[in-house]
């Protein structure tokens, strides 16, 4: 019996409204923000795009290891999706990677496969300092990195 009471007490603390408070003590702030985002955009699509962006960042770091200064500022997924064919996308990606001394063929082919499942999301872009309307992966990481 005592174990049941203890279990109920722990469970009630985990479910208490004070645990659901968002930043600044507002109840459910984080939960409500997710709800608004997923109403406008499909959450699964957003997660897929994020996964592709993380994959691109990781692979670029591998390809340019030791030569980070030569790394392209960005690989804009929306620009690639706007192109008509995979051949055009492939040429665009290869143009971005022209300074890479490591083999890039596998990266290009894998990225083309990952792009097949994505759709252009024009509302997701935020203005960049360069004024072209997009953030580079490096700029985005710097903007969202913890202090």
Curated annotation (Swiss-Prot):
It is found in: Cytoplasm. The keyword Cytoplasm applies. Phosphorylation of Thr-38 induces a conformation change. This is Protein phosphatase 1 regulatory subunit 14A. Changing residue 43 to A: Strongly reduces inhibitory activity. It comes from Sus scrofa (Pig). GO terms for molecular function: protein serine/threonine phosphatase inhibitor activity. Residues 127-137 have a biased composition (Polar residues). Changing residue 44 to A: Reduces inhibitory activity. GO terms for cellular component: cytoplasm. Keywords: Cytoplasm, Phosphoprotein, Protein phosphatase inhibitor. It comes from the Eukaryota. Pfam families: PP1_inhibitor. Residues 35-120 are annotated as: Inhibitory. Detected in aorta smooth muscle and bladder. Belongs to the PP1 inhibitor family. Changing residue 38 to E: Reduces inhibitory activity at least 1000-fold. InterPro entries: CPI-17, CPI-17_sf. The modification Phosphoserine is found at residues 26, 128, 134, 136. Disulfide bonds: none annotated.
């Amino acid at each position: 019996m005592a174990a049941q009471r203890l279990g109920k007490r722990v469970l009630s603390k985990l479910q208490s409204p004070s645990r659901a408070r968002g930043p600044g003590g507002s109840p459910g702030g984080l939960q409500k923000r997710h709800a608004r985002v997923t109403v406008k955009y499909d959450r699964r699509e957003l997660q897929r795009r994020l996964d592709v962006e993380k994959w691109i960042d990781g692979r670029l770091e591998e390809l340019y290891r030791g030569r980070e200064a030569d790394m392209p500022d960005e690989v804009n997924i929306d620009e690639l999706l706007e192109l008509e064919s995979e051949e055009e996308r492939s040429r665009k990606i290869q143009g971005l990677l022209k300074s890479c001394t490591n083999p890039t063929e596998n990266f290009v082919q894998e990225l083309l496969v990952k792009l097949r499942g994505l759709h252009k999301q024009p509302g997701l872009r935020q203005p960049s300092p360069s004024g072209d309307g997009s953030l580079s992966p490096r700029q985005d990481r710097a903007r969202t990195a913890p202090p």
